[in-house]
Amino acid sequence: MMGDVWGEKDTRFAFIGLAICSILGDINRIKVEPIVEYVEKCMNYDGGFGSSPGGESHSAQVYTCLAALAIAGRLDIVNRNRLSQWLCERQTQPSGGLNGRPQKLPDACYSWWVLSSLEILGNLHWIDASGLASFVLKCQDEENGGIADRPNNRADVYHTCFGIAGLSLVKYELDGHTLPEIDPVYCMPVDVVSSLGLSHGPSGWKSLLPSHWL
């Protein structure tokens, strides 16, 4: 899908286009099937997705593709177990953090990109949740607040947002309090998604899943 007047194509735009139309309640305004076909061409032998056909699998692209396919009602084309295995391999040791692709350093933002994808796939339990939570908490700026990409780096709003979203997905609890539940498709609190009329049924985002996944 093309994202600007200069013709740039990227699977991120597939998700963005579908999400915008879905949020506006006008999904039929966009041609869904060509988007699905493009996303499918970006799927790799390892189960992951690249930014374009033949591109290297990347955790952030995996999320955008899964979320796009979920909104389109076409998660059936995904190799669920193979992709889940690839995503689990993103957890690094001994840090417990997640990276975007092989041989890269862990980064707090992948707490969202990887975990949201595993949640959609129904295999979030394959990850060491306590190890991941420990890594994200170590990325905090104890004096000024916020979360950085890695421990001892400067915090920013980007990593703070996705670090907290990741903690929500693993149901991190502190002093008996948990974070609001996050919808893994839209990256918004579940109650916000519901108020916008995006729940897609009584089961919320799970109504978007293929029946044989449930």
Regions found by a protein language model. Give the residues of each.
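Alpha-helical membrane segments in multi-pass integral membrane proteins
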Residues: 11-15, 35-36, 40, 59-63, ...
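Solenoidal tandem-repeat scaffolds enriched in leucines and small polar residues
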Residues: 4-61
